Amino acid sequence: MSPIALTRLLMLAAVWGASFLFMRIIAPVLGTLPTAFFRVSIACAGLLVILALMRVRWDFNGKLKACLLLGMINSGIPATLYSVAAQVLPAGYSAIFNATTPLMGVLIGALLFREPMTLTKLSGIFLGLFGVGILSGAGPVAFDAQLLQGALSCLAATTCYGFAGFLARRWLDQQGGLDSRLSALGSMLGATLLLLPLFGYSVLTQPPASWGGWDVWLSLLGLGLVCTAFAYILYFRLLSEIGPVKASTVTFMIPAFGVLWGAWLLDESLSMAHLYGGLLIAVALWLVLKPAAVGRAVRA
């Protein structure tokens, strides 16, 4: 991995780590669908301005439909799921569950896209799941139905991420490539189109008790413009440069940022379970991302 790609990966980890902090502020006030919709729609508006200022030519090269569908899978659905999780999980929890993305990517790649699977990777997957299990007892939240709902929401979101990474490589990169800024815009457009009718129905039937104060809307701007618009430009650039599995290793670093942001700015407590679970996931990801040559291939 080149130094530039590594720098982008670190920037993306820092930015996405902060997103869990913002959602923890926003989601309990606005609710699930408003949080998800405002996140992607603000990101979409921000990308429109960025592309206009940079005078980027709007040439999707016949890939607009693919970008829209990717946006639904990679942004719209996960944004909703993480908004659900943010109402019941501390920011650090969501960030650490998000670290299972490469594990999901390995499984999906082997089962659906004929990516090589090794015994080493299988060991990493089970070790990672064990680490996530330890995390369910971390911090101030007792294990109950709400915690389980939040955890399953995060894991469903990471499954979407893993699936979308391979689709992006097949639909975009392997067919001539596409400017990462256009990929990000198309993705946000797709997510916005998916969530718009759901948001409208939600507001009409169950409007939020409060639309929040300045802190909520400043957090929304940060979530939409920095943690989504800017982040997805970086993400699609990394997908093109290093591939979906290596790009997904950004989630290896996100938990550290997520836990630190939560402890520093939201006064969320830290425990040894955070450390043990995070270390297990770190070892699991190292096993999963080792070159296939060091392990014995297993047919999926």
Where are these regions (language model features)?
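A helix-boundary/kink motif common to multi-pass secondary transporters
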Residues: 31-32, 90, 113-118, 176-179, ...
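Helix-helix packing/entry segments at the starts of transmembrane helices
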Residues: 13, 36-38, 75, 79, ...
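Hydrophobic/aromatic residues within transmembrane alpha-helices
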Residues: 26, 35, 39, 85, ...
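Hydrophobic transmembrane alpha-helices of multi-pass small-molecule transport proteins
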Residues: 47, 108, 117-139, 195, ...
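Membrane-interface helix termini and inter-helical loops of multi-pass transporters
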Residues: 22-29, 87, 136-147, 174, ...
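Hydrophobic alpha-helical transmembrane segments of multi-pass integral membrane proteins
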Residues: 4-8, 34-49, 69, 124-130, ...
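Specific transmembrane alpha-helical segments of multi-pass solute transporters/efflux pumps
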Residues: 15, 19-20, 48-98, 134, ...
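Hydrophobic/small/kink-forming positions within alpha-helical transmembrane segments
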Residues: 17, 21, 48, 72-76, ...
